[in-house]
A protein has these predicted regions:
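Bacterial N-terminal signal peptides that target proteins for export
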Residues: 1-7
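Generic short amphipathic/hydrophobic targeting helices enriched at N-termini
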Residues: 9-11
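C-terminal motif of bacterial Sec signal peptides marking the signal peptidase cleavage site
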Residues: 17-18
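A short glycine-rich, aromatic-capped structural motif
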Residues: 26-99, 122-126, 202-203
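Functional-site microenvironments in short loops/helix caps that host divalent-cation chemistry
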Residues: 34, 40-50, 103-216
Length: 216
């Protein structure tokens, strides 16, 4: 169910224990509630015309506890604040290049002009993990990320099974041609949100997850 995404950003989760209706109502508006229960994880490719990667096999059922997940990708503005509070470790968290949505000016990290509400990109896994801890949250597991993206009806894309277009997802855009216009603000493209209301689960930037992948 993957659509090509560029670079690395992050979203975060909070896990709930003993979830109740009151807990569902008492969290920030910028997070969405993902209920407990099973979902079908993975995607089986039966021919070359289908979406997906071979490493998405085998299809299997996973049961998750309830959790909250960020509705939006982390912005360049918010990540710059984190870096400024951890400047000694910042080089381990991100490498500032002309293709990154933040810059380092006069001893301070800041979002590039006009990109304040765009997703942070080119973040290392260590930077993503440290930022989540700084916020009192954590990275989602791959299973948590996929359920938040696809829901429980085995859809191919966050919005359903319809072919991707640029009203739903940053589709077939190249940084070499478009520069930062390859991305969109984190709260844009509402037609492409997931069943739970999470934005840009199939576009903008890649997101890190907590667990690691063994191709062997």
């Amino acid at each position: 169910m993957k659509v090509v995404k560029i670079l690395y950003g992050l979203m975060m989760v909070l896990v709930l224990f003993g979830c109740s209706t009151s807990l569902q109502k008492n969290f920030p508006e910028d997070m969405v509630f993902i209920p407990e229960g099973p979902f079908t994880m993975g995607y089986a490719i039966e021919n070359n015309n289908e979406w997906g990667d071979m490493d998405e096999d085998p299809v299997h059922e996973v049961t998750l506890s309830p959790y909250w997940m960020d509705k939006y990708e982390v912005t360049s503005s918010d990540f710059a604040k984190f870096l400024n509070s951890n400047q000694g470790a910042a080089p381990r968290f991100i490498e500032i290049t002309p293709s990154v949505t933040i810059e380092y000016v006069e001893g301070k990290y800041q979002p590039r002009t006009g990109l304040e509400n765009f997703p942070i990109n080119r973040v290392s896994w260590y930077g993503a993990d440290a930022y989540c801890q700084w916020q009192g949250k954590r990275l989602p597991t791959e299973a948590e990320w996929e359920k938040a993206a696809r829901g429980t009806d085995q859809r191919i894309f966050p919005w359903g099974d319809e072919f991707p277009d640029n009203s739903r997802v940053t589709f077939r855009r190249k940084f070499s041609n478009l520069g930062f216009n390859v991305m969109e603000p984190v709260d844009s493209m509402r037609r492409g949100v997931s069943p739970y209301g999470v934005h840009h689960m199939a576009g903008n930037v890649w997101e890190w997850v907590a667990d690691w992948f063994d191709g062997g």
